[in-house]
C-alpha cells in the first residue's frame, strides 16, 4: 500500500507548514510506520492496552490528475470514532494523498492527515490515523 519511500504526516497546526521545521503530531517514514504496526500487532504498544475499537468514515473523495500520468493527488474527509475504556472520542479532518504508480499498482507516497483540532489537547493519539 505504501511506497518504499513514503511520508506519513499529521501537522500540529491548521496551516500545515513544513514538517522538517515545525512541530508535528506525527512525521514518519516507512520504517517508522512499520515499527508502529509491529508494536500494535505484538502488544508492545502500551498506549493501546486494551486496544481501541474504531470506526472510520471517509467521504468527499476527490482525485486530481497531475502533469505526470504516474502521479495522482487525492483529497478526502474523514471521521474516526474511537472507543477506549475511558470513553469515546471523535477525530475528524481531511487527508491529502499523493499516489504514485509503481509497476502494476498505485502506492501511497505521501499521506497528510489534517485534524480540525490539531492545535488542541488531543490526549495522545495512539492509533494510526
What label would you give each PLM region?
Residues 3-74:
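A solvent-exposed, acidic/Ser-Thr-rich amphipathic alpha-helical stretch
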Residues 78-84, 98-101:
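Beta-strand elements of well-folded, non-transmembrane domains
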Residues 16, 127-129:
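Flexible, surface-exposed loop regions and adjacent strand-edge segments
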Residues 73, 92-124:
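Short beta-strand edge/turn micro-motifs at domain boundaries
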Residues 10, 29, 115-117, 129:
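Generic structural "secondary-structure junction" signal
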Residues 17-18, 82-84, 116-119:
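A short local loop/turn or secondary-structure capping micro-motif enriched for an aromatic residue
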Residues 86-88:
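Short, solvent-exposed loop/turn segments at secondary-structure boundaries
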Residues 2, 78-80, 112-115:
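Short beta-strand segments enriched in hydrophobic/aromatic residues
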Amino acid at each position: 500500500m505504501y511506497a518504499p519511500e513514503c511520508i506519513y504526516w499529521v501537522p500540529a497546526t491548521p496551516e500545515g507548514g513544513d514538517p522538517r521545521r515545525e512541530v508535528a503530531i506525527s512525521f514518519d517514514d516507512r520504517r517508522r510506520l512499520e515499527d508502529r504496526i509491529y508494536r500494535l500487532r505484538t502488544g508492545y504498544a502500551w498506549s493501546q492496552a486494551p486496544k481501541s475499537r474504531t470506526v472510520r468514515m471517509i467521504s468527499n473523495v476527490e482525485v486530481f490528475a497531475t502533469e505526470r500520468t504516474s502521479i495522482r493527488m487525492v483529497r478526502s474527509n474523514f471521521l474516526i470514532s474511537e472507543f477506549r475504556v475511558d470513553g469515546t472520542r471523535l477525530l475528524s479532518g481531511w487527508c491529502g494523498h499523493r499516489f504514485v504508480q509503481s509497476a502494476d499498482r498505485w502506492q501511497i507516497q505521501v499521506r497528510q492527515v489534517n485534524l480540525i483540532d490539531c492545535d488542541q489537547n488531543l490526549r495522545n493519539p495512539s492509533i494510526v490515523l
